[in-house]
Amino acid sequence: MANLIVIMGDSGAGKTYSIKSLDPAQVSIISCKKNRLPFAGNYTVRKVVDTVDQNGQPVFAYDQIKMLLRSSQKKIFVIDDSTFLLKNEQQRNIGLKIKNDKVNGFMQYEVLSFHFKDLIDFILDELPEDIFVILMHHITKDETGKVKTEVVGKVLDSLIEKSCDVVLLAEVENGEHYFLTESCSYATTKSPEGMFPPRIANSLKTVIEGYKKYYGME
């Protein structure tokens, strides 16, 4: 069972920038949208998009991610930005509906739910326990104004938060970037009691080290 951590936040809040604290030799960055990082360094970014192989058969982003997670020797993986896995597949399904009218609205969300949940289950059930997978994810607000992970449709509501023990919110205030770590009325953030202070530096290194120390993994 791998260790799944979610970093959620708006664009520009510092989700991706927090990678800079990690040693490039120890982290594998899987990008669902961007080709480059917002900082210099010898980091390798593997972009995944739906494509076709040389025989014209579809090769989906989800399958590429699983292959990278399974085959790499790295222990830390960042999937940035996992929101686009949902949005890109939604656009593909809309295209299918336009072409053949076989993908109705509810079925579209059922498919989205299945593929995203299947990826989370793969991370939690099939990867070794010394692996860390960090999902960088955009945010939205529910009907009460509470900040939560952005999903497509209602089928996936709260799935991400329910699937892991650590959900942090990236925020910026007066030019300072930081993570909120504890459950509150403002957002669906959470972490085990005593793992982190309520507010910590915008640093994946700090997050992973705190996690390891809490569970005696060092």
Task: Annotate each predicted stretch with a short phrase.
Residues D142-E218:
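Conserved GTP-binding G-domain of TRAFAC-class P-loop NTPases and closely related GTPase folds
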Residues K34, D50-D53, H138, V172, ...:
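Residues that form or immediately flank small-molecule/cofactor binding pockets and catalytic motifs
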Residues V27-I29, V133, V167-L169:
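Short, well-ordered beta-strand core segments
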Residues M1-S72, I76-I79, T83-N88:
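Conserved P-loop
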Residues G41-K47, I65-S72, L112-D118, V167-E173, ...:
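Low-complexity, flexible helical/coil segments
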Residues S72, E129, K162:
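Structured loop/turn residues at beta-strand edges in well-structured enzyme cores
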Residues K20-S21, D125, K162:
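Solvent-exposed polar/charged
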Residues D81-L159:
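P-loop NTPase motor core
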